[in-house]
Design a protein with these regions (language model features):
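Positively charged, low-complexity/disordered segments
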Residues: 1-7
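ATP-dependent adenylation/nucleotidyltransferase module used to activate substrates
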Residues: 8-9, 13-152, 156, 160, ...
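Conserved short-loop catalytic and cofactor-binding motifs
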Residues: 30, 64, 105, 169, ...
């Protein structure tokens, strides 16, 4: 596994972590493993990072079982063993809690999972949780916000928790492409779960492309745009780094909306 990790490990260490100052001396980071390819690679990269890094920090590898069926739980445990990841598994009943909710169960599930991860990580003395979102997640989120939410925003590389004082969320794979993660998975002949909730209990073998979600639609839109403009992904990513407030009609800061008219005649 380590042979195919070298290139990606340099990416996580020298790009996202340094660019956005994600890891600092003395940090104790809870690396959150969902069981998918992204979080598993992130866990391996943190092992490499800790081994080669110039300053000291600590990591804990966490797997939250929100109610996986036996097959999915087994896949996660086997992958952790095969990859040499000393993961701590803790239980929750999130799947049961959201199972009967008709409106936006996935959104609620994600929020609850993050809250449980923050809480358990804090109990372990961690000051940060690391999630496995990657570059493609970021650009898809930008477009989803524009096309379906009427807003310009991005998935941040790090942010302070609003509910757990002293805790931060970091995304070390922020600059890693999904195709590179898939290449690592395929090179090593690995198999991971995808979404494994009670709504999609067959997801040890399912294909995410069958899920006609908004994110899949956006992914397909980007792929089509890339056929015409090979730079479209980078341009979407950079667009939220180049916002000129002098050329927007309005913007929000700290929940307050500001209009260009506020200072138009000054």
């Amino acid at each position: 596994v380590s042979e195919c990790l070298v290139g990606s490990e340099m990416c996580i260490r020298d790009r996202a972590i340094n660019t956005y100052e994600l890891v600092k001396p003395g940090d104790k980071i809870a690396v959150c493993i969902s069981g998918g390819k992204d979080s598993m690679l992130m866990a391996k990269l943190f092992q490499e990072l800790k081994h080669h890094n110039k300053f000291d920090f600590d990591v804990k590898f966490l797997v939250m079982d929100p109610g996986y069926n036996e097959a999915n739980r087994h896949v996660i445990e086997e992958n952790c063993r095969n990859l040499g990841i000393p993961a701590t598994i803790f239980e929750s009943d999130i799947f049961d809690a959201v199972y009967d909710i008709e409106k936006s169960p996935c959104y609620l599930c994600a929020r609850m999972r993050r809250g449980h991860l923050y809480a358990f990580a804090k109990e372990l003395g961690c000051n940060k949780i690391a999630l496995g979102h990657h570059y493609d997640d970021v650009i898809e989120t930008i477009l989803m916000g524009m096309l379906y939410g009427a807003q310009v925003q991005t998935m941040m590389p790090k942010l302070h928790s609003t509910n757990f004082e002293g805790m931060e969320l970091i995304r070390p794979l922020y600059l890693v492409r999904e195709d590179d993660i898939k290449a690592w998975r395929d090179y090593n002949g690995l198999h991971f779960i995808q979404c494994a909730c009670k709504f999609t209990d067959t997801c040890t073998t399912c294909n995410n492309e069958e899920n006609r979600s908004k994110r899949v639609e956006i992914k397909q839109l980007i792929a089509n745009l890339k056929k015409v403009n090979p730079f479209v992904e980078a341009n979407i990513f950079k667009s939220v780094e180049n916002v000129n407030l002098a050329t927007v009609v309005a913007y929000k800061k700290d929940g307050i909306k500001h209009s260009f008219l506020d200072h138009y005649d000054e």
